[in-house]
Amino acid sequence: MLAVVMARRSDLNFSLCRLVAVAVDTDRIMKVGLELAGWKKMPADSAVHIKGKNISKVLIGIDIGTAELMLAKQLECDAVIAHHPIGATAVNFYKVFDRHIDYMVEHGVPKKIAREAVEKLKERIETRNHANIYSDVVGAAKALCMPLVNIHQPCDEYMRQVILRAIKAGRTEYVSDIVKSISKIPEFRHAATKVQVSFGNQNNKAGHWTLVVAAGTNGGFNIAKAYFQHGVSTVIYLHIDYGELIKMREEKLEGNLVVMGHLGGDSIGLNGLADRLENLGIETVRVGILPNR
């Protein structure tokens, strides 16, 4: 199977077309996702749910349901890539949360306290997901004979690296400096949900700060509290539940919480994945993903 790839040469002001042979299967797609993060092992929140081969066109989205699978079929896609866990990965999602422990210990939180905070988070999410009906999307894909992959933590890790570089490249004296650096990233710039300081004040000194993403989900109240009580002044989350935020306000913790925005962050990871697939000659249909330019 052949795909046409456009290579731009701005200095000569023309486009060069070249034919590239495409022979990609779902295992190769997963490998590209892992390479994106610099990893070799597939985490518990990512999987090849339905295998496929000879893939030259894929639909990529953050949340995939039956409607997106039908759209992919209508658009003659050969496979679908979801970001958020589906099927068994939605049940096993909590198993990647231990990365929070590594983050906290790295930033001075005693391991025992870090583990206790993460266990509370794992219990809450595991209990919630145990009640979910998790087989519908994979079942629909089987009925449609549509290869299906979901890649969650590896894309989030790529997103973490992009954001970390952006923060370190700018000023970090004040919380507002961090907000400005993140807001310049194209996906956050295009988002309707702007980067905000949900707790604390943007005029505060940032002090010791930490970016807490690519550990499955946000750390909520208990993990933020552990950071604040052990020398971290500014915590950066992708998102936070309202109830967890209220707990922080009621306990009157001292610190700052920057919330970046879920769609903007996830779009960074999926754009990175889509760009690399296109480099292999795969056509991508990006659904609901914010632009990276």
Task: Give residue spans per PLM region.
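N-terminal amphipathic/basic-hydrophobic helices that include classical n-h-c signal peptides
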Residues: 1-21
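Active-site catalytic microenvironments in core metabolic enzymes, especially phosphate/sugar-handling
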Residues: 16-293
